[in-house]
Amino acid sequence: CCDDSECSTSCWPCCY
């Protein structure tokens, strides 16, 4: 996962 400001919810594939 990533540690984005909006993708840091849990482990969403929006940062892949």
UniProtKB/Swiss-Prot annotation:
Disulfide bond entries: 1-15, 2-11, 7-14
Tissue: Expressed by the venom duct.
GO cellular component, one term: extracellular region
Major localisation: secreted
Keywords from the named record: Disulfide bond, Hydroxylation, Secreted, Toxin
Residues with the 4-hydroxyproline modification: 13
GO molecular function term, any single one: toxin activity
Localization (cell): Secreted
Family assignment from sequence similarity: Belongs to the conotoxin M superfamily.
Domain notes from UniProt: The cysteine framework is III (CC-C-C-CC).
Name by which UniProt lists this protein: Conotoxin tx3j
Native organism taxonomy: Eukaryota, Metazoa, Spiralia, Lophotrochozoa, Mollusca
